[in-house]
Amino acid sequence: RYIICGHTHMQGFVSDGKKKIINAGAVGVPLKSPKKTQYMILTSDGKDWKPEFLSLEYDVDTVIKEIHESGLWDASPYWCRITEHLLDTGELPHGTVLNHVMKLNDYQDPWYNIADSYWEKALDELGIR
């Protein structure tokens, strides 16, 4: 009767009258929720479960600073730039950017072998600094 999930990174509730799908959102990198973390509290009235969707601001600047300090930026600069943009704006998830990069590359190479020039062009076209 209930499906509770969170992998889409967006809070939401859908029902067809019989089944209810409840998405708690994302604590780390939510979509459409810049500089906020998301969670959900489920309460029961004894008959049904009701979701309460909550969002809290958190210190995104510290998270970004820690990404730089961890060395991850050096190992994966494009992933880090996309993540920073997503944390700041709530827009352009990694999959969307990856699809754009692969399209620019005419789907000729696997994602892990695509030249940096395609990544740079994609991030520039999408407005990711």
Q: Can you name each region flagged by the protein language model?
A:
Residues S15-A24, G28-R129:
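Acidic, His/Gly-rich catalytic cores of divalent-metal-dependent hydrolytic chemistry
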Residues Q11-F13:
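Residue-level recognition of beta-strand microenvironments
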Residues R1-Y2, K50:
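Short active-site oxyanion
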Residues Y2-H9, I21-G25:
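Active-site neighborhood of phospho(di)ester-bond hydrolases with catalytic His/Asp-centered motifs
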